[in-house]
Amino acid sequence: VDECMGRVYDAVKAQSDTVLLVTADHGNADCMFKDGKVNTAHTTNPVPFAVCKAGVTLRSGGRLADIAPTILEIMDIEKPSEMNGVSLIK
């Protein structure tokens, strides 16, 4: 896996307009609706997250809910008010 990821990383680095995002999800949403409300507690679990893009540095201490706002910032798209995460970009 490491060797294959290295090859993917090298291919992305060779492109000037490509971003590589690597993460894992060990949160879960087995019960989305328990009491009629969305259960988002799983979005606070820590997960690995790496961004390979020139000029982008991530802060530490993020959570799963911060990944989508980070991707939106990279894409220069405004974060919806419903999202409670914050971008990991310093």
Where are the predicted features?
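Feature captures the catalytic ectodomains and active-site-proximal regions of enzymes
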Residues: V1-K90
